[in-house]
Amino acid sequence: MNQYETVFILTPVLSDVQMKEAVEKFKGILQAEGAEIINEENWGLKKLAYPIQKKSTGFYQLIEFNAEPTVIDKLELNFRRDERVIRFLTFRMDKYAAEYAAKRRSVKSNKKED
């Protein structure tokens, strides 16, 4: 199993309920394929660097997970088919990226406790 991180941008015309529904759909796909979700972050509505599909903002989502390489093809196929997703990027984390992500999560959880 490899550790992956995926960031996807949802169209800004979605309501909060629709956005959460889309995120749950992709998390469900991962879990159905046997992936273990490590972390999930909603980065909120952000301005895009350049317009995509005539939209200048989007809802950013990050999901970190452990999965077999075959799961990525199924996940990305669903990203491509879903018109709510305007961009996505999935990459395999090496040991340094995984350590950094764990450190970042622990710092973030410490800030929440304060």
From Swiss-Prot:
Highest taxon of the lineage: Bacteria
Swiss-Prot/TrEMBL keywords: Ribonucleoprotein, Ribosomal protein, RNA-binding, rRNA-binding
Cellular component aspect of the GO annotation: cytoplasm; ribonucleoprotein complex; ribosome
GO molecular function, one term: small ribosomal subunit rRNA binding
InterPro entries: Ribosomal_bS6 (IPR000529), Ribosomal_bS6_sf (IPR035980), Ribosomal_S6_plastid/chlpt (IPR020814), Transl_elong_EF1B/ribsomal_bS6 (IPR014717)
SUPFAM superfamilies according to UniProt: Ribosomal protein S6
Biological process per Gene Ontology, one example term: translation
Function: Binds together with bS18 to 16S ribosomal RNA.
PANTHER family assigned: MITOCHONDRIAL 28S RIBOSOMAL PROTEIN S6 (PTHR21011), SMALL RIBOSOMAL SUBUNIT PROTEIN BS6M (PTHR21011:SF1)
UniProt similarity note: Belongs to the bacterial ribosomal protein bS6 family.
Name the UniProt record assigns to this protein: Small ribosomal subunit protein bS6
